[in-house]
Amino acid sequence: MLEQTDLSLEQLLKNYYETTNEKIVFVNRQGKIIAMNDAAKDILTEEDNYNAMTNAICHRCEGYSNEYDVQSCKDCFLETTQLQHSNFQVFMKTKDNEIKPFTAMYQNIDEQRGISAFTLQNVAPQIERQEKMYQQKMLHRSIQAQENERKRISRELHDSVIQDMLNIDVELRLLKYKHRDKVLAETSQRIEGLLSQLIDDIRNMSVELRPSSLDDLGIEAAFKSYFKQFEENYGMHIKYDSNIKGMRFDNEIETVVYRVVQEGVFNALKYAEVNEIEVSTHSDGKQLVAEVVDRGKGFSLDHHPKGSGLGLYGMRERAELVNGHVNIETHINRGTIITLDIPI
């Protein structure tokens, strides 16, 4: 039952026909286009209007598919009766020669007069959204698999390789003290030094891959371990400020924060030309905010340093996986501020 209005059903339908983005074309039993709304003229030109046969539609059609398979012109929807009163997907070429996907319906609306209606709804935006969601899903799986593999290799290096090398070191020391030979002692001493350096390198590699403290103790412990190692390796001081002492977050959030800050710190090392980097992590219970600040060279976002583009892009991609946002503020000769904001 229609609510009483000043407009009749006929007027309401007329208004819809004239204002909708849906493309509506009426065709008679001879295949002539007898009417179309303004929206349809994005596909069918004025020259096609009213006097043209259905081949006007055919010339714009780039193929269609039903629920089972991709169809060809041989099984044209304008000829088959199987698609009456059903939805299907069709690809049409616009006046600008762009090929766009549409959800279409072709149905007989007046059997006595042989009039059929052909309607098109542009589904390109929905398909784009679906593709983006699919890409994010695949990215999420890829990053998750990468982190799991990093964790596995890191644990293997720490629990197996380093332990075996420590056992070799012990055996080497025993050999040195067991045989009082000057040449052997000097050689053993030199090998011990090389072995010790190799153990340190593998420990650093294990932490770089994925620190066990990130999974066991959380962000703050992982950062303290990483910053200490970073200062020892590169001689750059990191000033760290935080109010999240002992707080734990979702494992995926902690991983994103760690990786984004790690990338920000490493970019500052490579490009900022500074002796100190400031890092902060703060939470108010609703948001988790991490910041990496350097007072160095800065750069133009339009012409970022060579090699940094993928890193900056990767930060944003990772942040999006946890509904976060990365903002980069930079000024030439004034430095760069990278801010990660994640709802929790």
Swiss-Prot record:
SMART domains: HATPase_c (SM00387). [4Fe-4S] cluster binds at C58, C61, C73, C76. This is Oxygen sensor histidine kinase NreB. Its cofactor is [4Fe-4S] cluster. GO terms for cellular component: cytoplasm; membrane. The gene is nreB. Its EC number is 2.7.13.3. Residues 147-344 form the Histidine kinase domain. Autophosphorylated. It is found in: Cytoplasm. One of its GO terms (molecular function) is phosphorelay sensor kinase activity.
